[in-house]
Amino acid sequence: MDKLELVNDGLNIIDFIQKNQKEIQKTYGRSSIQQPSIKDQTKAWEDFLQCTSGESEQVEGGMSKDDGDVERRNLEDLSSTSPTDGTIGKRVSNTRDWAEGSDDIQLDPVVTDVVYHDHGGECTGYGFTSSPERGWSDYTSGANNGNVCLVSDAKMLSYAPEIAVSKEDRETDLVHLENKLSTTGLNPTAVPFTLRNLSDPAKDSPVIAEHYYGLGVKEQNVGPQTSRNVNLDSIKLYTSDDEEADQLEFEDEFAGSSSEVIVGISPEDEEPSSVGGKPNESIGRTIEGQSIRDNLQAKDNKSTDVPGAGPKDSAVKEEPPQKRLPMLAEEFECSGSEDPIIRELLKENSLINCQQGKDAQPPYHWSIERSISPDKTEIVNGAVQTADRQRPGTPMPKSRGIPIKKGAQTRNIHLLGRKTCLGRRVVQPGMFEDHPPTKKARVSMRRMSN
């Protein structure tokens, strides 16, 4: 073939490619590259296995049997001993024919399929009061030996350990099984879940907390009147307008002790009977409906009306002073006396009692200015503030009160307390309508309450 013919063939090939470009790209393009078919893969594996088993026409090294006088290794001339007797001999194939007699790959005949069964009241012959045996049962015999529940969704497990159940355990009743269950951490008094008609609550059984908390206590030790439900009446919400909306505090279920409140009393609403020694019943009354505190009544009787404390101008009448109840040291018995805030409150309480005996006008507000060191707390000389003045730079929050009607009078009890430990609510220093607390005092009291 001369050069001219080669050039013509090349031109013809180029012309053919240009005319059939789309078909060629579909057949030989990059998109057609994929894995070989299963048939090709099977043929390749068969060729490879024949090479490794010595049954092909090609031996090691790639030499053929028809290579002439080249010295090669003849596999048929080797000894035909099996490799199990410790002798190096004939090469044995690593493959095994699947349809060849008894050499099919299968499970070990020693391994049996077992199922774990648990009598949960599903079997007719075994209930809660008879033979609650649990364990593994052998299914190789193909027959039910009477100790197995034929559950449709039973899971067949292989290689599972077989637990031997003695005859005594098979005859054990549930009453004697409680001790064994309690030692393993299970609840022996737990009852199975039963469907109940929610539309008819009268038929519901009483709730027993031990069934849900797993305390291991027998049912007869718990009375039917026992209730572990949270009393919703004891949960109350306390907030203030000067705080963020998301900082809400709740009382816990232990809120059964006393609590102090701030009572809004205007001078003209003072009862004349309170001067004569009759205690004001609205002061010291707890929100939970408890009895009136005796010690608050005794201290309240000391503060009587004074001629010098008459009505003032109209601006003061619009904002009546808030009468502060005395702080009690017993409210801080759980927090410790080393807290600087507690020491300040105790000092303030003692000064209030002394001032009530000396001055003719009862004090309404006290301002405590704390220094950097909490041990060197000093009280400002001009601590007594009038009702028409407030701390500079602090906004006056709106009071949220609950009106309590008694006779013809209506008084607002402002919930300005904050919880401490043991469910007690303590009045913060400066938490009044015209005397809001600073941010530092709020953070300190929040830490003490937590």
From Swiss-Prot:
Stored Pfam families: Paramyxo_PNT (PF14320), Soyouz_module (PF14313)
Phenotype when changing residue 274 to R: In strain: Isolate NV/MY/99/VRI-0626
Effect of residue 378 to K: In strain: Isolate NV/MY/99/VRI-0626
Chief location category: host cell
Official protein name in the record: Protein W
Modified sites of kind Phosphoserine: 257, 350
Swiss-Prot/TrEMBL keywords: Host nucleus, Host-virus interaction, Inhibition of host innate immune response by virus, Interferon antiviral system evasion, Phosphoprotein, Viral immunoevasion
Stated role: Prevent the establishment of cellular antiviral state by blocking the interferon-alpha/beta (IFN-alpha/beta). Interacts with host STAT1 protein in the nucleus, blocking it's phosphorylation by IFN-alpha/beta. Also blocks antiviral state induced by Toll-like receptor 3/TLR3 binding to dsRNA.
GO cellular component, one term: host cell nucleus
Compositional bias ranges of the Basic residues kind: 438-450
Bias (Basic and acidic residues) ranges: 63-76
Stretch list, region Disordered: 53-92, 265-324, 384-403, 429-450
Assembly description: Interacts with host STAT1.
Signal peptide range: none
InterPro entries linked: Paramyxo_PNT (IPR035430), Soyouz_module (IPR025909)
Placement of sequence motif Nuclear localization signal: 439-442
Other facts: The P/V/C gene has two overlapping open reading frames. One encodes the P/V/W proteins and the other the C protein.
